[in-house]
Regions:
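Sec-dependent signal peptide recognition
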Residues: 1-7
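A structural boundary/capping signal
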Residues: 12-505
Length: 505
């Protein structure tokens, strides 16, 4: 990756031949590298060449001649330091820098959105679903209630505008949408080097790697954090991207042949790669819902810490952006239950009962178990209990779930989690017995029947394998969905025991 202060560290009076050689190696379409060169050598011949190139890349001639746009080497150094950050210190640009970038960015397409002027959370909540400026919205969520919030919003927004200018510098005026996507991928993931954080870090600090200011400060982000940055820049380029959210994930899409996987440097992955045994189809989100997903991610941190009041508060705020979302309602009701606020739990779960989740095949046991009186706050806490990566943590969870099941044998969610935990521990016999017991209470769950078919095959139990195989085939036909995992399992069974195979021969 381009090193931030390579040029700044060079001698102030280098040999002209060396300068000529150095400049010839700069990417002519990289606005940042041209700016670095000019910022360090403004009075040299090559520095003036860089200045001329900067004016060309910024398309200064297309701007209003009355707008004050003056190239300033010191100002450029500050802007570049803000984009190529080497510390997590918050970005705070002065007014001249902000005004300078704003004057250069008046043609950014996000300026036509009503949401580009929002300054409070109320503005966002009441704003039009598809007229939200995602960059401004995320900055309002982060800073809107702080005394100096407006200054911070404008400062970070200037950095977003500057980043969009850097992407535009690589594009012709007739650039296609596909070319814009490729230019954004190059700038974000290669020139700036944005990366997915280490697994151990992102699990503990998912809020840090989700909120847009933190993503800009760290140049790292989880799928949602980098997708928010990507979408904010796309709006400035006039790109209308679709937003999809498989459970626990998010990706963007220009069209079905060009999806954007922000955890893998923007590569395309087919829609089928995001579907699974549990997920029949994908939720398509609005710009407003995208902001709500950030609050949703924040709440998971407090849920993990068992701060159920704070988690519930954030889930409530997320619902203002994503009304009637089944996953948020389930987690909100669960937080209320674990906090022993039964009246609020009843209100939320009553609402959830009326909502049909079309995209998921997995049955929701928690709501039904609550109304049947099978569930307890302590039992639910065991289900949501976080586990470490070590084996002992899983073993301890299995012991806790065993105790919960013994105390509440009809609590299906606990029994399901116990079976899955046994699977993770490779205790296949125990997993089979636990899930088969659950099957007597819930025989219409495709995921459950898939696991029982797989475990029967692992145990080489032909009668049970064929029994559950037929049930699985019935359920996937009923739901009109045949995921790849099921296809592979059925092929494996057919290969081992072909149809019409007589074991007595």
């Amino acid at each position: 990756m381009f090193k931030i202060f390579t040029l700044l560290a060079l001698s102030q009076s280098p040999d002209p031949l060396y300068l000529e050689s150095l400049y010839s190696r700069q990417d002519p379409l990289s606005l940042t590298k041209q700016l670095y060169f000019y910022a360090q050598y403004p009075d040299t011949h090559e520095g003036q060449r860089a200045k001329k190139k900067i004016l060309e890349l910024l398309d200064i001639s297309s701007l209003d001649p009355l707008m004050p746009v003056e190239l300033n080497s010191i100002l450029f150094e500050e802007l570049l330091k803000a984009v190529f950050k080497t510390t997590t210190k918050p970005i705070l640009l002065d007014s001249p820098s902000i005004n300078f970038i704003n004057n250069l960015s008046l043609n950014h397409k996000n300026r036509t959105l009503k949401g580009s002027s929002h300054l409070t959370r109320g503005d966002l909540e009441n704003g039009d679903t598809c007229d939200i400026d995602v960059g401004r919205g995320m900055l309002v969520l982060a800073f809107g209630e702080e005394p100096d919030g407006k200054e911070k919003i404008l400062s970070y927004e200037a950095v977003l505008d500057f980043m969009a200018l850097c992407v535009k510098a690589r594009l012709s005026k007739e650039a296609s949408n596909e070319e814009k996507v490729h230019a954004m991928n190059h700038f974000i993931f290669y020139e700036l080097g944005y990366r997915f954080p280490a697994h151990s870090e992102h699990e503990e600090k998912i809020d840090t790697y989700t909120l847009l200011p933190s993503v800009l400060d760290n140049r790292q982000g989880v799928c949602l954090g980098v997708s928010l940055l990507y979408y904010a820049l796309a709006q400035r380029l006039g790109l209308n991207l679709d937003i999809y959210t498989p459970p626990g994930h998010i990706f963007l899409s220009l069209h079905e042949d060009l999806n954007i996987e922000t955890t893998a440097r923007g590569i395309h992955m087919p829609i089928e790669a995001y579907l699974s045994l549990h997920v029949k189809s994908l939720n398509k989100r609005t710009q407003k819902e995208l902001l709500g997903m950030a609050l949703f991610n924040q709440s998971s941190v407090f849920l993990k810490k068992q701060d159920f009041k704070k988690a519930a508060d954030l889930y409530e705020k997320a619902l203002a952006f994503i009304p009637d979302d089944p996953q948020i309602l389930e987690l909100l009701g669960s937080c209320y239950l674990m906090d022993k606020q039964l009246a609020k739990t009843h209100r939320v779960f009553t609402k959830l009962q009326k909502i049909k989740e079309k995209n998921l095949l997995t049955s929701n046991y928690i709501v039904e178990d609550f109304f049947k009186g099978y569930i307890t706050p302590e039992g639910l806490q065991a289900i949501f209990k976080d586990v470490d990566s070590d084996m002992q943590s899983l073993i301890n969870k299995s012991y806790e779930l065993e105790a919960i099941h013994k105390k509440s044998p009809k609590f299906r969610s606990a029994l399901y989690q116990l079976g899955i935990t046994y699977l993770q521990l490779h205790q296949y016999e125990k997993a089979f017995l636990a899930l088969e017991k659950l099957y007597t209470q819930a025989d219409d769950d495709p995921a459950l029947v898939y696991y029982l078919t797989q475990l029967s095959l692992i145990r080489f139990d032909r009668p049970k394998t064929l029994l559950y195989k037929e049930k699985l085939k019935f359920l996937i036909k009923k739901h009109d969905y045949n995921p790849q995992a099921v296809q592979r399992l059925l092929e494996e069974i057919e290969h081992l025991w072909p149809s019409g195979f007589d074991t007595n021969l």
